[in-house]
Amino acid sequence: MIMALLAEPVVTTFVRAFLILLLASAAIPKLRHGEEFFGVVRNFRLMPEWLARPFALVLPWLELGIAVGLVLPVTAPLAAGLAGGLMVLFGIAIAINVARGRTAIDCGCFRNGMKQKLSWLLVGRNAGLALAAFGLAWLLPVAPAAGPFDLAIGFAAAGLTMLLIYGASLLSGLQSGARSSQLSKG
């Protein structure tokens, strides 16, 4: 019963569209502001210095490529699996730094106004995203094809979800910015 519900075209379309929007909205600012993203990568201190710049150059293109792969029905299951793997890697990178006590750094997920400090909550978020992506990779080959109504509802719901997440992230960033400026004033 639950598997049939999860394999509903409107559900798979929603998850697919959400991952497309998430990956594209994460990749584009990294491409536009490469030096800033390079600084974020270096700040994680998980790789040798000489590898940080190539990684910072390749990662946004990988995110964008996976987003494009999710658009195409023939490559969507593979792209969903790759998205899940990427979320696991991001979660591990965040978890390592949280365990080190390095929570004051930006996760690099999005850009400036949406800076998010590292936390176990972000690790959990990435675990949930990985689970959704791996589930999508598993369900897409057996899910019925989406019709126009499924596509419209799935993409609209994904777009609204992204807007809500962006809004919450912006408000959180404004709150933490206000708190840090109050602390610096004494």
From Swiss-Prot:
Protein's name according to its UniProt entry: Methylamine utilization protein MauE
Signal peptide: none
Biological process according to GO: methylamine metabolic process
Subcellular location: Cell membrane
Topology term for the membrane: Multi-pass membrane protein
Alphabetical UniProt keywords: Cell membrane, Membrane, Transmembrane, Transmembrane helix
Keyword hit for Transmembrane: yes
Chief location: membrane
Transmembrane segments: 2-22, 54-74, 76-96, 129-149, 151-171
GO cellular component terms given for this protein: plasma membrane
Domain of life from the UniProt record: Bacteria
Purpose of the protein: May be specifically involved in the processing, transport, and/or maturation of the MADH beta-subunit.
Organism: Methylorubrum extorquens (strain ATCC 14718 / DSM 1338 / JCM 2805 / NCIMB 9133 / AM1)
Keyword Cell membrane among record annotations: yes
Alphabetized InterPro entries for the sequence: Methylamine_util_MauE
Pathway the protein acts in: One-carbon metabolism; methylamine degradation
